[in-house]
């Protein structure tokens, strides 16, 4: 999945408005940001393989308290697209915060996919969890996070009712206590009403399940339009930047702590996540 039509439109406008973006510099930054897609995917794949190897080793040779195991599902925002470094993605920052709070080893499997829709989660990511023994299998799963819907909002053939039906089936497959987020604001884009409708459906589905809601939509609606457009987003004007992902991670950490009836960890105070990957990608984009 390449650069979105929306991103090209915004970057093109930026190139014509040098006073805002330095002309063609905006398009150059956009292209560099898009290179994250492959880099981050490969880094997460490498990390996941190393994590699975660690789980197998522990299964064969248990050593003390088992690690706290997190699985993250969803789309490119879960991959960390837009963050300057993959370790600044919200799953990595959340995992680091939980590890610091619990003083315990935390293992993170990120099964998300850039461009994913709710159909992708139901038909690809959930079966992948089953195949890896994470659902009704040998591994004890402690937490699942799910962020999905942004691509569904943009897909004209995805009816909101169909989105909700698939989401409810996904939630029924997940262990209790999953953290599920609403869809961030689409600002002045014409799809904003669909984003609101689908977010409302996410909230309703979560309320009928054993999951917990993480309200990213309310967070993003608090920003003024200029701040949301230029300070919150990365160069593609679609994905959050590193600072915004820190706020996402804090909301997830807050929901996690509330579900456990304990004080929430401070995400900004947690150390950088130590990924089990020799391919920890760092984009050239400097936000």
Which functions belong to the PLM regions below?
Residues 107-109, 177, 210-212:
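Conserved beta-strand segments of alpha/beta enzyme cores
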Residues 119-130, 161-168, 172, 246, ...:
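Amphipathic, non-transmembrane alpha-helical secondary structure
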Residues 47-66, 122-140, 168-172:
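Short amphipathic alpha-helices and their capping/turn segments at secondary-structure boundaries
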Residues 1-71, 259-287:
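N-terminal secretory targeting modules
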Residues 69-71, 79-162:
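Conserved SGNH/GDSL esterase-like catalytic core that processes O-acyl groups on lipids
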């Amino acid at each position: 999945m390449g650069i979105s039509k929306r991103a090209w439109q915004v970057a093109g406008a930026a190139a014509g408005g040098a006073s805002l973006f330095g002309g063609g510099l905006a398009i150059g930054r956009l292209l560099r940001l898009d290179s994250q897609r492959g880099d981050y995917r490969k880094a997460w794949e490498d990390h996941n393989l190393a994590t699975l190897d660690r789980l197998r080793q522990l299964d064969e040779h248990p050593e003390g308290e088992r690690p706290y195991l997190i699985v993250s599902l969803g789309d490119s925002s879960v991959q960390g697209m837009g963050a300057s470094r993959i370790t600044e993605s919200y799953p990595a920052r959340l995992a680091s915060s939980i590890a610091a709070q619990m003083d315990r080893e935390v293992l993170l499997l990120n099964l998300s996919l850039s461009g994913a829709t709710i159909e992708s989660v139901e038909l690809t990511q959930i079966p992948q969890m089953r195949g890896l023994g994470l659902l009704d299998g040998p591994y004890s799963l402690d937490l699942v996070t799910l962020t999905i819907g942004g691509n569904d909002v943009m897909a004209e053939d995805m009816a909101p009712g169909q989105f909700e039906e698939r989401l409810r089936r996904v939630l029924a497959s997940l262990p209790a206590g999953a953290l599920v987020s609403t869809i961030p604001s689409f600002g002045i884009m014409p799809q904003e009403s669909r984003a609101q409708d689908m977010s409302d459906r996410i909230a309703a589905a979560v309320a009928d399940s054993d999951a917990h809601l993480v309200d990213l939509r309310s967070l993003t609606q608090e920003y003024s339009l200029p701040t949301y457009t230029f300070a919150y987003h990365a160069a593609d004007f679609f994905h959050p930047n590193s600072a915004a992902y820190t706020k996402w991670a804090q909301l997830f950490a807050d929901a996690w702590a509330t579900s456990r009836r304990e004080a929430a960890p401070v995400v900004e105070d947690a150390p950088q996540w130590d990924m089990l990957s020799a391919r920890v990608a760092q984009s050239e984009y400097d936000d």
